[in-house]
Amino acid sequence: MTVITVSLEKKQYQVKIDRRLHQEIGQAVSLVWTPRRIALLTDSHVGPLYLTAVQQQLEMSGFEVLPLQVPAGESSKSLKTVGELIGKMAEKGFTRDDGLIALGGGVIGDLGGVVASLYMRGIALIQIATSLTAQVDSSVGGKTAINLSHTKNIAGTFYQPDLVLVDPTYLDTLADRDLVEGYAEVVKTSVLAGGSFFDLTGRIYGVTDIRDNAEELSTRAVAYKAQVVMADEKEAGQRQFLNFGHTIGHAIELLAHGELRHGEAVAIGMIAMSSRMTRDGLTPASLTAALRARLETVDLPTTSDLIGTPAFFKHMVNDKKNRGGRLNLVVLKDIGQPMIVQKAIVDMPDFINENEGNNR
């Protein structure tokens, strides 16, 4: 078992990575929580596969479990769903001494984090990550969020879990497309980290390679993210680097109305930004080519006709990284050398469209 400790100013917790964790959930939870009521949140995809087994293990370990299931997909990351879940927990008499476990991928992790942070001003939270996106990225670091109609992840909190469990065997039931979109976050982290991690993603050529190397990919990605989060928990500095590809990615993800997965949109965003900065002479052309190759070899998209449209820029204005009319854009000086470039929102159409031929 790999154990990565996240040590913050006011909290410390462990991320455990092992292929046997799905059989040891009750024991793992008992090490950090005393017996209590647990709201076990999942979705309509993960629930039929794993909810019963997890619930039984928790109950055998002395916990009282309230199973909560929401429809799978981004539509559940809403204020309406948050209100419904909080209402169900209140009806069952949950108190501040109880807890919530998010059993699922990025959507459930985000949603569960928001609910846990808001219920009675905060109850204990554990993340059990079942998708690659969650295992390598979203379950670690305490960022939680829901969507409003025109903006992704616009309402949320920083709320750290008490424990994160990552079992790569959960990926066995994940569809190839869902696996690959999570791999986009792995590539992102590897180019930020550089070194042997970036070399590793250069040896991944397809879905089989992702599955075969899932444990190492998760370990490398979580170790890097934990290091960044410990240095900058609230995203005041270097944690912003983890947003590489996301400013453009979030905008086109919303415009695609479900046709693009999150990781697919991030892949497009990374190449769009790197190509633009290569044109300016900041990002080496060889880096952009290496990044593109890592994404395209697993069939991730790297272009979109949605970039540069009026609706695209409207979504960028609403981006949560908009600070005083300026966007902090993450760009790469080299492998393992991210930096922030500030651009005024009003200048973004010229900045993006000047290079649109390379992105369409």
Swiss-Prot record:
A Pfam family the protein falls into: DHQS_C
The entry's keywords: Amino-acid biosynthesis, Aromatic amino acid biosynthesis, Cobalt, Cytoplasm, Lyase, Metal-binding, NAD, Nucleotide-binding, Zinc
Biological process, per Gene Ontology: amino acid biosynthetic process; aromatic amino acid family biosynthetic process; chorismate biosynthetic process
Organism superkingdom: Bacteria
Cofactor: Co(2+); Zn(2+); NAD(+)
Residues bound to NAD(+): 106-110, 130-131, 143, 152
Pathway(s) annotated for this protein in UniProt: Metabolic intermediate biosynthesis; chorismate biosynthesis; chorismate from D-erythrose 4-phosphate and phosphoenolpyruvate: step 2/7
Compartments in which it is found: Cytoplasm
Catalytic activities: 7-phospho-2-dehydro-3-deoxy-D-arabino-heptonate = 3-dehydroquinate + phosphate
Residues that coordinate or bind Zn(2+): 185, 246, 262
Cofactor note: Binds 1 divalent metal cation per subunit. Can use either Co(2+) or Zn(2+).
GO function terms (MF aspect): 3-dehydroquinate synthase activity; metal ion binding; nucleotide binding
Gene3D superfamilies listed in its UniProt record: 3.40.50.1970, Dehydroquinate synthase-like - alpha domain (1.20.1090.10)
Record-stated family: Belongs to the sugar phosphate cyclases superfamily. Dehydroquinate synthase family.
Name of the molecule in the record: 3-dehydroquinate synthase
EC number: 4.2.3.4
Organism: Leuconostoc citreum (strain KM20)
Main location, first listed in the record: cytoplasm
Signal peptide annotation: none
HAMAP family referenced in this protein's UniProt entry, alphabetically: DHQ_synthase
Coiled coil: none
